[in-house]
Amino acid sequence: MKVIVKYDPAGRMGNRMFQYTFGYILSKLKNCSFYHDSLPNFKISSNLEGVGNLNNHINTRSYGDQYADIDMLVNHEGDVVVDSFVQKSRFYIDYREELKSLFKVKDTIVNKKKLVLHIRETDYVTINAFLGYDYYKKLIGDSKYAEVIIVTDNTKSDTVQKLVNEDGCTLSTEGTVDNFTVHSDSRAIDDFKTLMYSENIAISQSSFSWWAAFLGNHKKIIFPFKTGLDWWPASPGKDDIDLYFNIDKVTQKYII
């Protein structure tokens, strides 16, 4: 038996981390071989050349985009293809410390007593998942941090420019994601590390910032939820994204 990860073609680094990690955990539970393509941002190489033919396989996508029946997959007498997004925090919480080692996370804290805010813009405007200026302004005001640093995929966006020029925020790095790439460039990795190692962070509804929150050692994590927005619903259904966690009692749900 074996577990094979089949990355979704539309998935970027964060989404691929979910698929890879789900496959990694499942292969450990099944005590079987694990095959996957590369995650070069974490120096994980592909080993797909040895995968061979599939045997009585089942696809995780058969359960849905996010939901999967772990017990059934573990007991399945055959191969498992991980081809869904599997974005449920409960799949990963028990393995957090092991995953920190897997992804080579350091025991580092920076930006103490500051809030680092992630703003995902670009494609989120198109898919109606962008939280918007009013949301971020209220979050910043309610959080009461004297200094706010913005990590974003588009420093030219009206929202980001307004937060910098009118509300006193500063930028961690400058730039715009113009083209889709499945792996992150050096600027994006710098932003990821800033989020992961900062003392206090407010994430966006993105897998990129979720992994930074989950793997880091934070004093405060603010999770964003917006009433009426289907992306990351505040009350998720069976096959919705459900990534809220509060492992160390440091996490806050921020809903407007």
Predicted regions and their residues:
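Secretory-pathway luminal glycosyltransferase catalytic domains
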Residues: 3, 39-146, 155-158, 248-250, ...
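Short hydrophobic segments within beta-strands
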Residues: 8, 118-120, 151, 224
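A short, glycine/small-residue-rich beta-strand->loop->alpha-helix junction that serves as a flexible
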Residues: 8-18, 124-130
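Donor-binding and catalytic core of enzymes assembling or modifying cell-surface/extracellular glycoconjugates
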Residues: 13, 146-222, 231-233
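Histidine-anchored nucleotide/phosphate-binding helix
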Residues: 18-28, 136-141
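A short beta-strand-loop structural module common to alpha/beta enzyme folds
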Residues: 30-42
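Nucleotide-sugar donor-binding patch of glycosyltransferase catalytic domains
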Residues: 210-256
